[in-house]
């Protein structure tokens, strides 16, 4: 990770490793997990319900976990606990579970895995401090991890004929690496466990109109991405795309996202984060129209995926900038919890469930 370790003053390699392995897991989960559930004989509605648990648990676990961590004398232990629970619960997918069993295990895994990232974002920001414009240079390793797994797992499942049933076995070692990375990371300084004044300041900021508008925009964005993350691979399969080709299309989007993260510090020196956010929202509407109208036109599907640079990469980088602005210092952990919880959680589950009924 030479690009990451080249930045002095904070543990770039350690921070980057967590993003790499965390999003590598999502590189398998996001495009292929619905196909895995389908291979176990589940129908569209059942898959929709199970996949919606990823978003449903986001409603509760991020804010709960960040609050518990913030009030703990050793908050880093909550990161370790969450990662350990994610590994342990995911291992249960190796068992021959019925639908109820899948529901319970999926709930436990999604709860734990969603819980840890907002806390780690706060850890990252504690190291970056005034250099938050360099966040993209750390976060980009998550996109690289995602793309490595999307491409390699698609090849292993399709070309090497391991079959989609091998997916949990392939994912488990990557999850173990997430736990390993969590164990070598820590806060830049020990957070203050006395939170009364901070909690009051957070609630006051949360009521500000521009902060409310930001969270509404984030909510609507996640509603639109819910169907994409849940059913895009199945949608591609129905239109004749092989598993390997699906992996390529997912990879194209993340490659575009990587470019934006690498350029993010330059972008935010030129344009305000709020303006970047609005442009990202506009690009999302164009993307979904192209995906709906031209599923059999491969070049246009590639072009639609390239807009991921804007409607995810630019959106997310701008959101992190705004969260630092809206919730500075020790308020950032709470802000990250709300961002991952309410807009992403409620918006995502609404999008996934609505898509399952269409």
Enumerate the language-model features and the residues they cover.
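Helix-to-loop junctions at the C-terminal end of transmembrane segments
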Residues: 60-74, 157-158, 259-273
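Structural signature of the two symmetry-related core transmembrane helices
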Residues: 77-91, 275-290
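Symmetry-related core transmembrane helices of the 12-TM Major Facilitator Superfamily/SLC fold
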Residues: 166-183
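Helix-loop boundary and gating motifs at the non-cytosolic
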Residues: 5-58, 210-249
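Juxtamembrane intracellular "pre-TM" segments in multi-pass secondary transporters
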Residues: 2-10, 185-220
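Loop-to-transmembrane helix entry/capping segments in MFS-fold secondary transporters
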Residues: 44-45, 129-141, 243-244, 327-340
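Cytoplasmic helix-loop-helix junction between adjacent transmembrane helices
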Residues: 107-141
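Hydrophobic core of transmembrane alpha-helices in multi-pass small-molecule transporters
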Residues: 20, 89-90, 99-117, 219, ...
């Amino acid at each position: 990770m030479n690009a990451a370790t080249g930045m002095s003053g904070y543990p770039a390699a350690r921070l980057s490793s967590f993003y790499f392995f965390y999003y590598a897991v999502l590189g398998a989960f996001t495009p292929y997990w619905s196909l895995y559930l389908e291979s176990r004989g589940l129908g569209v509605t059942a898959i929709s319900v199970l996949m919606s648990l990823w978003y449903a648990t986001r409603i509760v676990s991020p804010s709960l976990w960040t609050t518990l961590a913030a009030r703990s004398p050793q908050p880093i232990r909550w990161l370790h606990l969450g990662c350990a629970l994610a590994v342990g619960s995911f291992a249960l997918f190796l068992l021959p579970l019925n639908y109820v069993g899948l529901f319970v295990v999926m709930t436990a895994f999604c709860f734990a895995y969603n819980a840890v990232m907002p806390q780690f974002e706060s850890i990252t920001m504690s190291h970056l401090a005034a250099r938050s414009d360099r966040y993209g240079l750390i976060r980009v390793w998550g996109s690289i991890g995602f793309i490595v797994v999307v491409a390699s797992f698609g090849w292993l499942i399709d070309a090497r004929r391991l079959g989609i049933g091998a997916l949990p076995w392939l994912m488990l070692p990557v999850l173990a690496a997430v736990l390993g990375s969590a164990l070598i990371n820590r806060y830049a300084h020990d957070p203050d466990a006395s939170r009364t004044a901070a909690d009051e300041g957070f609630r006051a900021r949360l009521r500000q109109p521009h902060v409310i508008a930001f969270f509404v925009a984030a909510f609507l964005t996640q509603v639109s991405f819910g169907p994409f993350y849940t059913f895009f691979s199945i949608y591609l399969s129905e239109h004749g795309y092989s598993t390997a080709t699906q992996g390529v299309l997912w990879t194209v989007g993340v490659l575009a996202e990587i470019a934006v993260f690498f350029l993010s510090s330059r972008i935010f020196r030129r344009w305000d984060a709020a303006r970047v956010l609005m442009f990202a929202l506009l690009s999302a509407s164009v993307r979904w129209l192209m995906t709906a109208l031209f599923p059999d036109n491969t070049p246009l599907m590639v072009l639609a995926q390239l807009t991921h640079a804007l409607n995810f990469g630019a959106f997310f980088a701008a959101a992190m900038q705004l969260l630092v602005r809206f919730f500075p210092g020790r308020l950032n952990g709470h802000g990250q919890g709300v961002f991952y919880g309410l807009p992403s959680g409620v918006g995502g589950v609404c999008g996934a469930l609505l898509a399952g009924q269409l």
